[in-house]
C-alpha cells in the first residue's frame, strides 16, 4: 500500500528559510504562490514578460521579476509553466544561474521523465503534483482544507529532497488532505494514460458517439444532449463522493441492470487491449516524441481538433442549452 503523509508527519522547517521562485502565474502558479506566501514562505514570482499574469501578480501583492532575476535570487525554483515551454525556459533562463544546492521543483514529471530537461547532478529535483486544478488548490487552502497530491524525488543531492517535497506540499495545503509518495515515472505515465484513455480522450469520445447515435436515429438533439452529455456530471459527482458502489446504489434498478449488461457490450475487452497499446506508447516514449515533434510544427492537430469540436452539433446544442442548465443552479 502507498505511504500517505498528512500534516502531522511534515515540518515546514526545512524550507522556512529558503527563497522560493514560482515560475509562471497561471492556474497552478497563482495558487501555489498565494498558498506558499500564506504559509510563511518567502516567495517571488518569475515571469517572461509584463502581460496579464504580471498585472495579476501585482494585484495579488507580489512584485513580479523577470524569470532569470527570480532564479538568481532563489534557492528553490518551481516550474509551473506549460509542459512544452519548460525546456526552453530551463535552458535559457534557469540553467545558466543554477548553483550547487539549489532545487528544481515540478508539478508534473513530463520534462524530467522524458529527459527534455537534464539537471546537473548537484541540485535536488523533486515533484509535488496536486490532484486538482489551480483554482481548487487555492479555494480549498483558503477555506482551511487542501487537495491531495503526489510527491516524488528524482535527484537527492542534499539528502533532504523528500523532506523538502513534503514541506512544499504542506505549504500549499496538500497534507491537510493526504500526500502519496510516487516516482516521476509513475506519475508521468499514469497521468498521461488517464488523460488519454478516459478523462479527456475516452470519456469525451464516448459522450459524443452516444449523442450522435441518438440524433442519427431521429431523436431531438436537445433531449439527446441532456441524456448523454449533461447528465454525465451527475454520475461523476456520485462516483467522486461515494465510489462506484455508491453511485449504483443511488441510481434506479433499471439503470443498474442496463448499465451492467449493455455497458460491457459497448466497452468490451477489445477496448482494454487498445488501452494497453496507448499505455505502451506512453511507456516507450513514442507519445512524448510524437507530441514534441507536433508541438514544434505548430500543434496543428490541436487546432484542427478544437475547430472540429467547436463546430460539432453536440457543441452547438450545448451552447444553446447552457443558459437553461445554469439558470436553475442555486446561487451560492
Curated annotation (Swiss-Prot):
Active-site feature positions: 108
Task performed by this protein: Involved in the biosynthesis of branched-chain amino acids (BCAA). Catalyzes an alkyl-migration followed by a ketol-acid reduction of (S)-2-acetolactate (S2AL) to yield (R)-2,3-dihydroxy-isovalerate. In the isomerase reaction, S2AL is rearranged via a Mg-dependent methyl migration to produce 3-hydroxy-3-methyl-2-ketobutyrate (HMKB). In the reductase reaction, this 2-ketoacid undergoes a metal-dependent reduction by NADPH to yield (R)-2,3-dihydroxy-isovalerate.
A molecular-function term among this protein's GO annotations: ketol-acid reductoisomerase activity
Pfam families in alphabetical order: KARI_C, KARI_N
Gene3D superfamilies: 6.10.240.10, NAD(P)-binding Rossmann-like Domain (3.40.50.720)
PANTHER family for this protein: KETOL-ACID REDUCTOISOMERASE, MITOCHONDRIAL
Domain (KARI C-terminal knotted): residue spans on this chain: 183-328
Record-annotated KARI N-terminal Rossmann domain positions: 2-182
Keyword vocabulary terms for this entry: Amino-acid biosynthesis, Branched-chain amino acid biosynthesis, Magnesium, Metal-binding, NADP, Oxidoreductase
Entry-linked InterPro entries: 6-PGluconate_DH-like_C_sf (IPR008927), KARI (IPR013023), KARI_C (IPR000506), KARI_N (IPR013116), KARI_prok (IPR014359), NAD(P)-bd_dom_sf (IPR036291)
Any one biological process term the GO annotation gives: L-valine biosynthetic process
Family, as annotated: Belongs to the ketol-acid reductoisomerase family.
Binding site for Mg(2+) 2: 191, 227, 231
Keyword Transport: no
Catalytic activity reported: (2R)-2,3-dihydroxy-3-methylbutanoate + NADP(+) = (2S)-2-acetolactate + NADPH + H(+); (2R,3R)-2,3-dihydroxy-3-methylpentanoate + NADP(+) = (S)-2-ethyl-2-hydroxy-3-oxobutanoate + NADPH + H(+)
Protein name as catalogued: Ketol-acid reductoisomerase (NADP(+))
Pathway: Amino-acid biosynthesis; L-isoleucine biosynthesis; L-isoleucine from 2-oxobutanoate: step 2/4; Amino-acid biosynthesis; L-valine biosynthesis; L-valine from pyruvate: step 2/4
Binding-site residues, substrate: 252
Binding site for Mg(2+) 1: 191, 195
Amino acid at each position: 500500500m502507498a505511504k500517505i503523509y498528512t500534516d502531522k508527519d511534515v515540518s515546514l522547517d526545512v524550507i522556512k528559510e529558503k527563497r522560493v521562485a514560482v515560475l509562471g502565474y497561471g492556474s497552478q502558479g497563482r495558487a501555489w504562490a498565494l498558498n506558499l506566501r500564506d504559509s510563511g514562505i518567502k516567495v517571488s514570482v518569475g515571469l517572461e514578460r509584463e502581460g496579464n499574469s504580471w498585472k495579476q501578480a501585482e494585484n495579488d501583492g507580489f512584485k513580479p521579476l523577470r524569470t532569470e532575476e527570480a532564479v538568481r535570487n532563489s534557492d528553490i525554483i518551481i516550474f509551473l509553466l506549460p509542459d512544452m515551454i519548460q525546456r526552453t525556459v530551463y535552458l535559457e533562463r534557469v540553467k545558466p544561474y543554477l548553483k550547487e544546492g539549489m532545487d528544481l521543483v515540478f508539478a508534473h514529471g513530463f520534462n524530467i521523465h522524458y529527459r527534455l530537461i537534464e539537471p546537473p547532478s548537484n541540485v535536488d529535483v523533486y515533484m509535488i503534483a496536486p490532484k486538482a486544478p489551480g483554482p481548487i488548490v487555492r479555494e480549498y487552502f483558503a477555506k482551511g482544507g487542501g487537495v491531495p497530491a503526489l510527491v516524488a524525488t528524482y535527484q537527492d543531492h542534499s539528502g533532504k529532497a523528500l523532506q523538502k517535497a513534503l514541506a512544499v506540499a504542506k505549504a500549499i495545503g496538500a497534507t491537510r488532505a493526504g500526500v502519496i509518495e510516487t516516482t516521476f515515472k509513475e506519475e508521468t505515465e499514469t497521468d498521461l494514460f488517464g488523460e488519454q484513455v478516459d478523462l479527456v480522450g475516452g470519456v469525451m469520445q464516448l459522450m459524443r458517439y452516444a449523442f450522435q447515435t441518438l440524433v442519427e436515429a431521429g431523436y431531438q438533439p436537445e433531449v439527446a444532449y441532456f441524456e448523454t452529455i449533461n447528465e454525465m456530471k451527475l454520475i461523476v459527482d456520485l462516483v467522486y463522493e461515494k465510489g462506484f458502489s455508491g453511485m449504483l446504489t443511488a441510481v434506479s434498478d433499471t439503470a443498474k441492470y442496463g448499465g451492467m449488461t449493455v455497458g460491457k457490450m459497448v466497452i468490451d475487452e477489445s477496448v482494454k487491449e487498445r488501452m494497453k497499446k496507448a499505455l505502451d506508447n506512453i511507456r516507450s516514449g513514442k507519445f512524448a516524441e510524437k507530441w514534441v515533434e507536433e508541438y514544434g510544427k505548430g500543434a496543428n492537430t490541436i487546432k484542427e481538433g478544437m475547430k472540429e469540436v467547436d463546430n460539432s452539433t453536440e457543441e452547438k446544442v450545448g451552447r444553446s442549452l447552457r443558459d437553461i442548465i445554469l439558470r436553475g443552479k442555486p446561487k451560492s
